[in-house]
C-alpha cells in the first residue's frame, strides 16, 4: 500500500502513478490496517462466504468446518486479506441483522485467534453488523453497497478500522437495476465512479478514518452493465491517479461471463486476464476466489514491472 496517503482525492498525480507506469511497492512486506501484507505485488483479498446461497460456491463454505478449511487454504496460498461475508450480494432470501451477525462474529473471533496477524475484512453494508465484526477482530470494512448506511464511516473510525468505498450508482443492496445509464458520453461511467468514490473516501477521512486505511472500489456488476465494466477496466489508471488505493472485485463476475459467453465455472481465464491488466495499471488489491492463481498472475506482473525479482534462476541470471 502507499506509505504516504494523498492529501486529497484531487491532488496532482504522484510520479509513480502517472499513466500506466509501475505502481508503488515496498520490498518484501508492507502493512495495511496494522497487519503485514505483501509489499512487492498487488494485494489479494480471499473470499470466504458464510452464506448458503453464494452466487459462485452455492454455500460451499457455509459450514464452520468448510469455512475454516477455506481460510487455511487461502492463507497457505498467499492471501493478504480474508474477506468474510454473511449475506449473498445478489437477490435472495432476506437475511436480518441478527442472522448476519450470527454467521460472522463467531467465525471472525475464531479467525482472529487462529491467525493473530492476518488482516481480516468484513463484507457488509450494515453499520450494526460492521460494529460487531470489528469488535470481534475485523480490521477492514468492505462496504460493497457504497455507503447505503451513512453510519459506516463512524464505525470504522471508532475501531480504527479501514474502509472500502464502493460505487453502486445508487443501486440498493441486493438489487440488479435494469438498463442502467450514465449519460451519453463515452466516459460517463468512469467520471461517475471517480466522483462518487473519491467523495466517499473524503467523507470517511472527515469522519475520522485514517487516510491510509481507505480504499476505493469501482464495484463491477454493481449498478453497471458489462459495457460499463469493460470501460472501467480500460480506465483503471484514471482511478489509480486519484491517489486512493484501488480494490478490484472481478472474480468470476458477469462482466467476464457475458464478455466471453461462458458459464460460471469457466470464468477463471477471463478473470485473470482482467486482473493482469488492472494490476499493470496500478490497482492495489484484488478480491478473489482463486488465491493461488491470482498470486502467480500478480507476481508475474510485478516482476515484469521491475518491482519483484524472479524467484529462482535457471538461465544464469545474476
Curated annotation (Swiss-Prot):
Superkingdom of this protein's organism: Bacteria
Family as reported in the entry's similarity comment: Belongs to the DHPS family.
Subunit structure: Homodimer.
Site residues by UniProt (Characteristic for family members without dihydropteroate synthase activity): 220
Annotated protein name in UniProt: Inactive dihydropteroate synthase 2
Function, in words: Has very low affinity for the DHPS substrate 6-hydroxymethyl-7,8-dihydropterin-pyrophosphate, but can bind the inhibitor dapsone. Seems to lack dihydropteroate synthase activity, and does probably not function in folate metabolism.
Gene Ontology biological process terms, A to Z: folic acid-containing compound biosynthetic process
Underlying gene: folP2
Domain Pterin-binding: 42-299
Organism of derivation: Mycobacterium tuberculosis (strain ATCC 25618 / H37Rv)
Ranges where the record places region Disordered: 1-25
Amino acid at each position: 500500500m502507499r506509505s504516504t496517503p494523498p492529501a486529497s482525492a484531487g491532488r496532482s498525480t504522484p510520479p509513480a502513478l502517472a499513466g500506466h507506469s509501475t505502481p508503488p511497492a515496498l520490498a518484501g512486506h508492507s502493512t495495511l490496517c496494522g497487519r503485514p501484507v505483501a509489499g512487492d505485488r498487488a494485494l489479494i483479498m480471499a473470499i470466504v462466504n458464510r452464506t448458503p446461497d453464494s452466487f459462485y460456491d452455492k454455500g460451499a463454505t457455509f459450514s464452520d468446518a468448510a469455512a475454516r478449511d477455506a481460510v487455511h487454504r487461502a492463507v497457505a496460498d498467499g492471501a493478504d486479506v480474508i474477506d468474510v461475508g454473511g449475506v449473498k450480494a445478489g437477490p435472495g432470501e432476506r437475511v436480518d441483522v441478527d442472522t448476519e451477525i450470527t454467521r460472522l462474529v463467531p467465525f471472525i473471533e475464531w479467525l482472529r485467534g487462529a491467525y493473530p496477524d492476518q488482516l481480516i475484512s468484513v463484507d457488509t453494508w450494515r453499520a450494526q453488523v460492521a460494529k460487531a465484526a470489528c469488535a470481534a477482530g475485523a480490521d477492514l470494512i468492505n462496504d460493497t453497497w457504497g455507503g447505503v448506511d451513512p453510519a459506516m464511516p463512524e464505525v470504522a473510525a471508532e475501531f480504527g478500522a479501514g474502509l472500502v468505498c464502493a460505487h453502486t450508482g445508487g443501486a440498493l443492496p441486493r438489487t440488479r437495476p435494469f438498463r442502467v445509464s450514465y449519460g451519453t458520453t463515452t466516459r460517463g461511467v468512469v467520471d461517475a465512479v471517480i466522483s462518487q468514490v473519491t467523495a466517499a473516501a473524503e467523507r470517511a477521512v472527515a469522519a475520522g478514518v485514517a487516510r491510509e486505511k481507505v480504499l476505493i472500489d469501482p464495484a463491477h456488476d454493481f449498478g453497471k452493465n458489462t459495457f460499463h465494466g469493460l470501460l472501467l477496466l480500460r480506465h483503471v489508471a484514471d482511478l489509480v491517479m486519484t491517489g486512493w488505493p484501488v480494490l478490484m472485485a472481478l472474480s468470476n463476475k458477469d462482466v467476464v461471463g457475458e464478455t466471453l459467453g461462458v458459464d460460471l465455472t469457466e470464468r477463471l481465464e477471463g478473470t485473470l486476464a482482467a486482473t493482469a491488466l488492472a494490476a499493470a495499471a496500478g490497482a492495489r488489491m484484488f478480491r478473489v476466489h482463486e488465491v493461488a492463481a491470482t498470486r502467480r498472475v500478480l507476481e508475474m506482473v510485478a516482476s515484469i514491472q521491475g518491482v519483484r525479482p524472479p524467484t529462482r534462476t535457471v538461465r544464469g541470471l545474476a
